[in-house]
């Protein structure tokens, strides 16, 4: 999951297998919706869920209610585990997550129909080029494509294949 309030929330539905591959079977993204909406989406999809993984910001308490999104989700029947942070600086964390996602992609199988929006976001995810300095910026562009890519980055940071792939 990549949780957004003003931004999109992105959900990747995946299954690991004994060979260490990851099947990305579905993808859902919406904007401006609260957690009750996503609880209904999960119910309507009628999948059997093992784990729901979310970034560390799920533990932030909302000013209005004093409850975290983690607590709200639990009250709706969604049990999240928090993806551990991989680095102390934001740019370092993003970079390490991008590297983890690149390493994971060779193990992924995508449902092309159900994951079309995710695949498009991954194809358009990029860094902005600074023409004055002749270099790419340290962090990726934050636009429509970053939500699905961030969800994959969190998944890649968390996912540990059960069996190494032969070289």
Go through each PLM region and give its residues.
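Mg2+-dependent endonuclease catalytic cores in nucleic-acid-processing enzymes, primarily RNase H-like
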Residues: 12-143, 160-167
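Histidine-centered active-site/metal-ligand motif
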Residues: 147
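Active-site or metal-binding loop neighborhoods of secreted/extracellular toxin and effector enzymes
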Residues: 154
